């Protein structure tokens, strides 16, 4: 017997804003979504700050959004968790940090601190780096090197200079730490096996290869003059004494896993074969658990279990479920949605569609959305699944490029693809829910009305319920899973503190 699925469509980076200037969502021609808003019950959801377990006012992101959606509860995120440990002093007692620094003292080796060098709050925060510098100072370490991965994606594209200047001032204040390398996240934080980029980063970190400039501020300013902003700054070597070598300690202070995995594997996994490099022993600390299978690492803040999230609960109830996305968001509908669990639950199938191999997604704003939609429709029509979780990456990934016209095309592509999936779901007698994990494409310009805005936003996101005539209340991302269970006639597990959006 064919199943009538409940399909959750996540339009990544599709926020709502009344502003018209720089708003790719409003500028786009979206006949499908316009029709769905007109015909079906809809509301708005909060997707940032305290409503998703982040600090007040902090913009949401894909990892946090999917964790909250899948968990059916507000999941306390790594950023405030680590920050709280600094405030209560337990940060400085952390066994992993202490092991890394004590090994440096015992071996006379260097400590390397690297991560995304910004206050974007998506992958990292400089407050955590500065706490590590303070700890190194207290312990009396002398050789401490910072490798600055510039952002320009979750922060303004030319903000990196000021972040590095701030860090240099902090080093002078503490009397410890030097900037050894500077490079854009494009090189050091790839997540799609673009090994040529990662190799450039590795060669700078280990072999001192790249642009040579002892002044990191000058190097960044020169890059800006050449039209190359933070995200894409080519690897610069500022201090050849600060290269990573045998028996050194490394602390990667990013707390978000997805863009920390590849470069970490290059350093710690003897079986790594993305490019040729020598393997040497390090004391390597991951700030959080980047991958449960990662060898030769210490984890400063192990994962907190999200028990009885939607995926686990549906599996226990004997339900079948599908997760489908292209490469850029595949980890989000699987690993993050399942609360950091790598392996699928019984009854959970996964479909990965390859993201296009382009330098930046403004060059192909359609990305792989049409193939994702086609494969999803095929599986809806199979009648196999009770629940389908789908992500369209376009609005977020193209929004990050800051190219307005491309973002408009991305929104229009998603609109068309949403229509295909909703139509297939309703034909099977199912229910479709349409939402987003955070905003992005609805704000493509900064407050000056001119400069590109490449970061996420704190705007609310939509929630549309197709196929079930009802009234909806306003809510937050944690309320989606309870709503799914509600329309399926299933009791909510006690661990979920989210509440159904349906007004009874």
Regions inferred by a protein language model and the residue ranges of each:
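Feature captures the catalytic ectodomains and active-site-proximal regions of enzymes
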Residues: 1-504
């Amino acid at each position: 017997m064919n199943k009538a699925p409940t399909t959750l469509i996540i339009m990544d980076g599709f926020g709502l804003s009344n502003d018209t200037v720089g708003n790719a969502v409003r500028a786009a021609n979206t006949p499908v979504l316009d029709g769905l808003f007109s015909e079906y019950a809809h509301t708005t959801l909060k997707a940032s700050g305290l409503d998703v377990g982040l600090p007040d006012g902090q913009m949401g992101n894909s990892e946090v959004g999917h964790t909250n959606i899948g968990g059916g509860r507000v999941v306390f995120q790594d950023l405030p968790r680590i920050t709280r440990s600094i405030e209560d002093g337990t940060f400085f007692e952390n066994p992993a940090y202490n092991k890394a620094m004590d090994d440096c003292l015992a071996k006379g080796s260097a400590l390397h601190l690297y991560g995304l060098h910004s206050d974007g709050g998506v992958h990292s925060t400089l407050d955590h780096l500065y706490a590590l510098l303070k700890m190194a100072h207290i312990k009396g370490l002398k050789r401490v090197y910072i490798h600055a991965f510039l952002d320009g994606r979750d922060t303004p594209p030319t903000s990196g200079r000021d972040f590095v200047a701030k860090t240099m001032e902090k080093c002078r204040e503490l009397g410890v730490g030097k900037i050894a390398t500077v490079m854009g996240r494009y090189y050091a934080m790839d997540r799609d096996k673009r090994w040529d980029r990662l190799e450039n980063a590795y060669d700078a970190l280990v072999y001192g290869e790249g642009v040579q400039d002892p002044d990191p501020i000058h190097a960044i300013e020169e890059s800006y003059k050449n039209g190359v902003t933070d995200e894409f700054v080519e690897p610069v070597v500022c201090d050849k004494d600060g290269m990573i070598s045998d028996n050194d300690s490394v602390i990667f202070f990013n707390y978000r896993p997805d863009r920390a995995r590849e470069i970490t594997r290059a350093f710690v996994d003897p079986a790594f074969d993305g490019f040729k490099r020598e393997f040497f022993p390090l004391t390597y600390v991951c700030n959080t658990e980047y991958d449960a299978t990662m060898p030769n690492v210490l984890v400063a803040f192990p994962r907190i279990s999200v028990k009885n999230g939607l995926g686990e609960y549906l599996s226990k109830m004997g339900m079948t479920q599908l997760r489908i996305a292209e490469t850029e968001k595949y980890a989000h509908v699987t690993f993050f949605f399942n609360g950091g669990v790598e392996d699928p639950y019984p009854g959970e199938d996964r479909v990965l569609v390859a993201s296009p191999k382009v330098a930046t997604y403004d060059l192909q704003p359609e990305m792989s959305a049409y193939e994702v939609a086609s494969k999803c429709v095929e599986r809806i029509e199979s009648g196999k699944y009770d629940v389908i979780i789908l992500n369209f990456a376009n609005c977020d990934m193209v929004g990050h490029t800051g190219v307005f016209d491309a973002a408009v095309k991305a929104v229009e592509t998603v609109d068309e693809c949403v229509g295909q999936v909703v139509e297939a779901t309703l034909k099977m007698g199912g229910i479709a829910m349409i939402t987003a994990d955070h905003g992005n494409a609805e704000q493509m310009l900064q407050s000056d009305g001119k400069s590109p805005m490449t970061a996420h936003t704190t705007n609310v996101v939509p929630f549309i319920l197709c196929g079930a005539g009802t009234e909806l209340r306003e809510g937050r991302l944690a309320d989606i899973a309870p709503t799914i269970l509600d329309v399926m006639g299933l009791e909510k597990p006690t661990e979920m503190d989210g509440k159904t959006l349906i007004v009874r």
